[in-house]
Curated annotation (Swiss-Prot):
Disordered: annotated segments: 1055-1101
A Pfam match: DNA_pol3_finger
Gene name linked to the record: dnaE2
Amino acid composition bias (Polar residues), ranges on this chain: 1065-1074
Cell wall biogenesis/degradation listed as a keyword: no
Name of the protein in question: Error-prone DNA polymerase
Organism: Ruegeria pomeroyi (strain ATCC 700808 / DSM 15171 / DSS-3)
Amino acid sequence: MTYAELCVTTNFTFLTGASHPEEMITRAAELGLHAIAITDRNSLAGVVRAYAALKELRREADEAIRIRSQHRIDSCSRQEVGHPQPIARPEAPRLPRLITGCRLVLRDSPLHWIALPRDRAAYQRLTRLLTLGKRRAEKGDCHLDLADLLAGCTGMILIALPQGRLDGALPHLQQVQRRFPGHVFLGAAPRYDGSDQAWLAACARLALRSSAPMVAVGDALMHRANRRQLADVLTCMREHITIDRIGTRALPNAERRLKGHADMARLFRDHPAALRRTLDIAARCSFCLSELSYEYPDEVAEGETPQARLERLTAEGIVRRYPGGAPQRVHELVAKELKLVAELGFPAYFLTVHDIVQFARSQGILCQGRGSAANSILCYLLGITDVSPDQIAMVFERFISKYRGEPPDIDVDFEHERREEVIQWIYQRYGRHRAGLCATVIHFRSRAAIREVGKVMGLSQDVTASLSGQIWGQSNGGADPERMRELGLDPEDRRLALTIRLIGEIIGFPRHLSQHVGGFVITRGRLDELAPIENAAMEDRTLIEWDKDDIDTLGILKVDVLGLGMLTCIRKAFDLMREHEQRHLSIDTVPQEDAATYDMLCAADAVGVFQVESRAQMNFLPRMRPRTFYDLVIEVAIVRPGPIQGGMVQPYIRRRQGLEKAEPFGPELAAVTARTLGVPLFQEQALQIAVVGAGYTAEEADHLRRSLASFRRMGTIGAHRDTFIAGMRRNGYSQEVAERCFGQIEGFADYGFPESHAAAFAMLAYVSAWLKCHHPAIFACALLNAQPMGFYAPAQIVRDARDHQVELRPICVNASDWDNRLERRADGALALRLGFRQIKGFREEDAAWIVAARGNGYPDPQALWLRAGVTPAVLERLAEADAFADMGIGRRDALWQVRAIRGQAPLPLFNDPLDGEIIHEPQVTLPAMHLGEEVVEDYVSMRLTLRAHPMELLRPAIPGLTPHDKLASVAAHRVSVCGLVITRQRPGTASGVIFLTLEDETGVSNVVVWPKIYEQFRRIVMGGRLLRVTGTLQREGIVVHLIAQRIEDLSPRLADLGHPMDSAVGQTTPQTDSAPRPRPQPRAMHPREQAKRLFPSRDFH
């Protein structure tokens, strides 16, 4: 006899469950359970993951791979368990059935209710019920009452779970039993506190009185006993307490783990019928998630089917894209794609994306499709993508495959500032009952895990800050004992050691649901009958509980409505060109193959240029020397994990530079990689090598690509290798060539970049480069107005604009708008005037009032206050940004005048001054600020300066430095440089190497920090803002790197520039009707901390 567990809480009951759904399924299979019900609190968020895990186990079983196989990898704990000897091939294990359900927690019932839908209709009622409760509540909550349960739970098995005492449970139990006779049970879970048998006996008596039969439940919180301490930590997080105050809220033991039949039979030895009923209930719950049939909406005119409309629009697209007539190859591609789309039932999907793109363009919103969709001629003809078959080799199977049985995925980028208009149009077009965003699961990463677990464990803020400060970026690596010793912590300390272990366990746990960046699910019928819908944190947005992986598992189509800052930048640049140059451009009409643009890129002059502005890309540009659009496609794709890890970068560059010859494997394969000099760089080429070389069908080749990573982990890649090599040998290739081809595909199967995606991005890279080359003032203005986006902060964008001879003008209350704007100079060139948006904390609404009331200008701050009606706090921000300098009023004087105005706030007895009467402060002469203080104040208020660079002022006090612009020509091999850290990078493909970009008044330098040096100077590398680096120069053409040997943190020297003027002009006068209060004094800040605040870097990993 076996057992079905009908009550399992996973970690998708956030901060409660202590195991992943996948872990619960795997453990249930190991225990031999007949069935398992995933029943999270008012949620179905984790059930698809359990379903996917069960499918994977079934696939493994079909291939005779045991659950505890030779190389079983637990993706949740990221641990691999191996066996020294191969395990004998076993019979396929018996797997549990998955029952979909949830735990309904009502506002007016002392019982929790496990709801298990028996069929699809009942499932639809459950999702509608959950949607009702979630739409009533704020994000993350669900408000349901007993009346909702009585109205909406037809067709479900309902198991009542008493919470604490049984008093008061009988009336509710009887009421629900009368409403759903034969479907209501009393769930009895052991309490594991020594009173189990007495408790179960009391439950049996209540079941008899209520006519609701008793059923055994384990009420599992974890898959194994070793998660007990983590469960207690989650309780503390949920209750906002430390572990020392948990008291009776702690689990008394580890018994709330998932149990097998033997354990449950022992606990329910006096109630065997309760155990048998678990199997009866499991048998009655026949619903499976595979029954969810998704139907895409078909919004078409009467008398025209979706397929007919798609064919009509395609024909119109051929005329538009090929006014002189399309070549035969285009017609063949169209026929092939239309046939497959019709066969798979996807025409309405293409039409929906087309309609969304057409709406955006009708509103002047730039958009562009990308990703694998650029492999589709239909997407090109419908105007969804702009990559033509003349530019890349389209491999439609990379986009849609009959073999995969998965829906296509079209990603469309829109201007990030106007994407909300598109999102709201989708809601209006289809209704919120049919359209919703996907969820994104926010997980515990290292920093959050250290912070939250450290707080629960009672670690001081200093200790947790030190630990988290040693984590790079968003790493999942946890805390290293060696790092702890460096920080003066004892890793042998029992509490600290336990904290570190718990941090490692919680990393990867879901923390809460958020909204996907733009993945929309749109249905023909009710979306809330597919998945529960809840409110998002953002106003006017709703989302389903499942993320993109969940809907992929279930074969549900989504439309990705994504935001891209560069599209916003390009559109704003086109607007500025139309306004100032009377030139009308679009992405399609930008002059192509411009030599000056490519010259600029070859010189690594690419700050702000889309996709090629990182230091790695800028270092690669002079080696690549792009001269055509396809060169840019390769440039975008080659500095990626796939080609780097596959060892393909150096062979390509050597061949491009003529240092080695391509080694063709035969005319057929040579044609596949001809444009990449015999080196496969793209996923599409991997597919074509399998088809052309090994005789695979297109579907088989795509299956190979997708399977390589998982088969490599499972240790069974040999079978695929043998099949591939045998296919190539049959086609006449040698064993050596076959093995090399397979090695190339295997080398970057995990990370290979699609050629179609690279081409879509390369188009934007070229357009942005052309704008920067020929219209630097316009490009810089648009780039600043599109922030936040990109690789560099506004300070670097401003500096780069000056390097391109663009005049920068400061913020001025009589000249600036909210946006940065262009002003015509006397010589006809364009100057860039900084806008109010550059002031930290300034609101667009306040800027609008200032501009609207400006007229012929403001003579002084008081006039601005009276005419624009802004608050004194706004005036202070303007004064701190030196926005009154055009009036001849310096920072200190302006701040003095503004605080005098603040002192004129209405008196309680006399709200209005007498006619024309204004209280005037006596004239005060304040000391002028020196240049260093001005620079500090610029960074405080705007994070940039148009004055001197900090290094220009500090250089006389730091001798022995080589300016950055001299590194390419200096004769010395060993040099020292110093500069502000503007970026830190630690790519996953760089084997622990750190790349720093330092900036001084002459330019930037690229610093390479090898792992050994990084370990020696780790805290300085990660935390310093002004670094002096001594090392050796490495030159390759115009690219110069400094290989670090010694690193010093000079951040405290930035304090020599001056201190923020917190008390430079005295105190604010309190209002008369307020009790006098001393001005709060800011906490004294260490110079290193001040440097971090004033001169932040952008760190990438």
